[in-house]
Amino acid sequence: MSGNPGSSLSALRPTPPERGSFPLDHDGECTKYMQEYLKCMQLVQNENAMNCRLLAKDYLRCRMDHQLMDYDEWSHLGLPEDAPGNNGKTIKDATDNK
């Protein structure tokens, strides 16, 4: 006897995340964006600052571009849409051209 009637092994099966898998970035393709975001969060003491949210957007865009997550609308991720005429440029793209 198991000592715990009514339990089954199927109840112990892990369930996948609600929005699908979130693969690790084994090749470090988006590490730079992640580190910039984390550094920003540290500077603002983990407050929800807009400049950090825009860095998070750059990080998520990198993950989408490298097939590390599915493409999704920014509004579904709680982030502002790209400005018209921005052509999907990131903050880093804009500052790298200076």
From Swiss-Prot:
**Region called Disordered, residue ranges:** 1-25, 76-98
Task: Name the chain's protein.
Answer: Cytochrome c oxidase assembly protein COX19
Question: Is Ribonucleoprotein a UniProt keyword of this protein?
Answer: no
Role description = Required for the assembly of mitochondrial cytochrome c oxidase.
Question: Which UniProt keywords are given for this protein, alphabetically ordered?
Answer: Cytoplasm, Disulfide bond, Mitochondrion
Coarse class of the primary localization is: cytoplasm
The chain positions of domain CHCH read: 27-70
Look up what happens after changing R63T. Answer: In COX19-1; causes a respiratory-deficient phenotype because of lack of cytochrome c activity
Q: Provide the GO biological process annotations.
A: metal ion transport; mitochondrial cytochrome c oxidase assembly
Q: Which domain of life is it from?
A: Eukaryota
Assigned GO CC terms: cytosol; mitochondrial intermembrane space
- The biased composition feature labelled Polar residues covers 1-10
Note, other: Present with 5750 molecules/cell in log phase SD medium.
Q: What is the lineage of its organism?
A: Eukaryota, Fungi, Dikarya, Ascomycota, Saccharomycotina
Disulphide connectivity of cysteines: C30-C62, C40-C52
Span(s) of short sequence motif Cx9C motif 2: 52-62
- Recorded GO terms, molecular function? copper ion binding
Q: Where in the cell is it found?
A: Cytoplasm; Mitochondrion intermembrane space
